[in-house]
Amino acid sequence: TKDEGTFIAEGGGVR
């Protein structure tokens, strides 16, 4: 998921 915070949980996305 490309969201701030979820990049760690989802394994990708915007920091």
UniProtKB/Swiss-Prot annotation:
<dbReference type="GO" id="GO:0045087">
    <property type="term" value="P:innate immune response"/>
</dbReference>
<comment type="subunit">
    <text>Heterohexamer; disulfide linked. Contains 2 sets of 3 non-identical chains (alpha, beta and gamma). The 2 heterotrimers are in head to head conformation with the N-termini in a small central domain.</text>
</comment>
<protein>
    <recommendedName>
        <fullName>Fibrinogen alpha chain</fullName>
    </recommendedName>
</protein>
<dbReference type="GO" id="GO:0007596">
    <property type="term" value="P:blood coagulation"/>
</dbReference>
<keyword id="KW-0964">Secreted</keyword>
<keyword id="KW-0356">Hemostasis</keyword>
<keyword id="KW-1064">Adaptive immunity</keyword>
<dbReference type="GO" id="GO:0005576">
    <property type="term" value="C:extracellular region"/>
</dbReference>
<keyword id="KW-0175">Coiled coil</keyword>
<keyword id="KW-1015">Disulfide bond</keyword>
<keyword id="KW-0094">Blood coagulation</keyword>
<comment type="function">
    <text>Cleaved by the protease thrombin to yield monomers which, together with fibrinogen beta (FGB) and fibrinogen gamma (FGG), polymerize to form an insoluble fibrin matrix. Fibrin has a major function in hemostasis as one of the primary components of blood clots. In addition, functions during the early stages of wound repair to stabilize the lesion and guide cell migration during re-epithelialization. Was originally thought to be essential for platelet aggregation, based on in vitro studies using anticoagulated blood.</text>
</comment>
<dbReference type="GO" id="GO:0002250">
    <property type="term" value="P:adaptive immune response"/>
</dbReference>
<keyword id="KW-0399">Innate immunity</keyword>
<keyword id="KW-0391">Immunity</keyword>
